[in-house]
């Protein structure tokens, strides 16, 4: 499936991608410049373009955008050789909705950023642990565990370079890493697991091939499915693999070339939903030998280095990315024949942004660059924005101090603040290093400035599916909402682990009785933060618990 009408594939050294309107992007994976010609089929519109050599680091390909006048398919030639024909899907670049205006109110409206504090590494990979500490690693140096309470770091060495690996949390709370770094676009087959209770790494049986930039997603069974990436030889790995806790199973019926770090989610039907970065979205069935089925096309074109998040069970927001867009769109996988729909646009176009779920059910966007090149650091976006799922409207919040683009990360902490860190550990297309941001900032959202917070004085540590749990709180009558958020695991503009759901509850004189999910599809086994909120949407500190 897909709009390609020539033999071009995602492994081709020169590719064409459709964006929106009459806009295309040409990619060159050759280590040398290539002169190409292009033509809009069915018209006399044509031109020539020199594609820069692929950079040695960062993206592994050079990119140039072409905007044409006519609405036909774009054909790309090298000499007399036809390289690719890319159809023009004729979709709009912007939805017909307004953009927000900047509020100049105080912290109770726009929130507040901390000063940037030093970190020992560039935190390209960021994970919340069971005790509220944070595990991070980059391209260089040992993985570090940061203690927010003491603002201290402890290194924990591992036998693999975990840079550009994929990761997820297991049902027992292990931070599971798959793949890693040999060199740019060449991945390790290694499988490693960090036990936060003992602070130790364990090496597990390796995958069949290396993977650099894969995505790891937990299934309802607690098994992990690994999709995408490039192997030891720089060849795209087309066959997904499933880890059952002791061994690997190849999904030989699901061969497909996918972009780096596919935006994958566990869908309500138990399959894996691939939301992008490509325009066409699909389901991956993991039973037997596996298989792909088409769901439909997004409204905007390729959203490379955009952010995607499951903001409610089965409902996904995809925002930013591409060259470069402020648009956002959603899909509801709970309905028959799901289709993508426009929602409100951000105030600023962004790529390399991070999207973080908040206890209020909103989605916070931080960082990124509005430039049209791969990582235009001179065009960094500092204004945070928050999306309201009920209205589809974005609101501008306070601005941070540090430019955070490629390799920046963000996660929600139990106290309701958002850790924003990383950016760098890469070189640009001219061989110059991007600034390495070995520091972290903390964002306190507006809800932390709206008065006293509800408190959880006790709650079960390891409740079962479908249980009604007693959550003690001093003023149960003040509690208006209860929500559950899976603890985060972020890298490369995507948190593959976070998901949010509202919970039903009743009140007693001393507690709220909260009904937990019954479905392992809606809430895969593992660790979550439970929040209770008052009528002003002020959340408690999250209580980390294991759902099993």
Predicted regions and their residues:
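Kelch-like beta-propeller repeat domains
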Residues: 98-548
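Asparagine-centered strand-capping/turn motif at beta-strand->loop junctions
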Residues: 26-30
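Short beta-strand/loop motifs in extracellular/secreted proteins, especially
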Residues: 22, 32-37, 72, 478-480
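Edge beta-strands of extracellular beta-sandwich domains
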Residues: 2, 80-98, 539-546
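Extracellular Ig-like/FN3 beta-sandwich strand-entry sites
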Residues: 31-33, 69-73, 525-527
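Conserved structural position at the C-terminal beta-strand
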Residues: 76-78, 532
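Intrinsically disordered, low-complexity Pro/Gly/Ser/Thr-rich segments with frequent PxxP/GP/PP motifs
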Residues: 44-71
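Short, compositionally biased P/S/T/A/G/V-rich stretches that sit at domain boundaries
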Residues: 1-17, 446-461
